[in-house]
Design a protein with these regions (language model features):
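RNA pseudouridine synthases
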Residues: 1-138
Length: 138
């Protein structure tokens, strides 16, 4: 299919509060937390490069819907980077165990785009925001 960077993925996440600044780039390296095989943290000394671009799409009901594009693809990158900014994902059992609004991470892969390897035509696929996430913004 070609190099991985040719595939563009865009995610939507819901966080509590008004994200400030409303757009930007998070350049904060990630590493495992202690002996955990799962949990990650920002670690400027030992972490691997991790870059996330974000932009607030909408604010409603005390929450922000945020568009996120990964420049790198580290485990839990979006979850840890948003927590690092002070805006963890709603319903994230590991980094923000607040299940008041949703019983899973409020994170959705909504757009995938790439150049078709044979026809060279641009391809784009989208998936609507799930109802449980929409309900948070009502």
């Amino acid at each position: 299919m070609g190099a991985r960077h040719e595939i563009k993925r865009e995610y939507l996440a819901i966080v509590r509060g008004s994200v400030t600044p409303p757009s930007g780039t998070i350049n904060a390296p990630l590493a495992r937390t202690g002996s955990s095989m799962i949990e990650r943290k920002v670690d400027f000394e030992h972490g691997e490069r991790a870059v996330t671009h974000y932009k607030v799409v909408e604010e409603k009901n005390g929450h922000s819907l945020v568009s996120l594009i990964l420049e790198t693809g580290r485990t839990h990158q979006i979850r840890v980077h948003m927590q690092y900014l002070g805006f963890p994902l709603v319903g994230d059992y590991l980094y923000n165990p607040d299940m008041e609004y949703i019983h899973r991470q409020a994170l959705h892969s909504w757009k995938l785009s790439f150049i078709h390897p044979i026809t060279k035509n641009p391809m784009e696929f989208t998936a609507e925001l799930p109802e449980d996430m929409k309900n948070i913004l009502i």
